[in-house]
UniProtKB/Swiss-Prot annotation:
A molecular function GO annotation: DNA binding
EC numbers for this chain: 2.7.7.6
Taxonomy, superkingdom: Bacteria
One annotated GO biological process: DNA-templated transcription
Catalytic activity field: RNA(n) + a ribonucleoside 5'-triphosphate = RNA(n+1) + diphosphate
Protein name per UniProt: DNA-directed RNA polymerase subunit omega
EC supergroup of this enzyme: transferase
Family of the protein in this entry: Belongs to the RNA polymerase subunit omega family.
Pfam name, any one: RNA_pol_Rpb6
Quaternary organization: The RNAP catalytic core consists of 2 alpha, 1 beta, 1 beta' and 1 omega subunit. When a sigma factor is associated with the core the holoenzyme is formed, which can initiate transcription.
Known role: Promotes RNA polymerase assembly. Latches the N- and C-terminal regions of the beta' subunit thereby facilitating its interaction with the beta and alpha subunits.
Biological source species: Deinococcus geothermalis (strain DSM 11300 / CIP 105573 / AG-3a)
Amino acid sequence: MAEKDIDKLLSLTDSKYRLSVVIAKRALQLRSGAPSVLPVEQRVRTRNLVTQAMRELATGKLTVGTGLMDENRFHQDYVRQKQAQLQAQLNAERERERD
């Protein structure tokens, strides 16, 4: 990221340490399957999730303290989604076996 973007990110938090924690948490959420909040045309063309998290924060799509889910709630939502997907797959397989 450009130096001006990093300066902007630093201005969003009270310390560089808090900024690094916020970015790390968002990168973990992205790795766990959370969708990007950026429109497709603004997404970073990289697999580096830290860069993507920084871009989301820099563009104002996330704000410190309001745009990040509580870790436990995010994990619970993610587990529920995965369970629903697996149940749907299981139901589809059972339907095919009946036919």
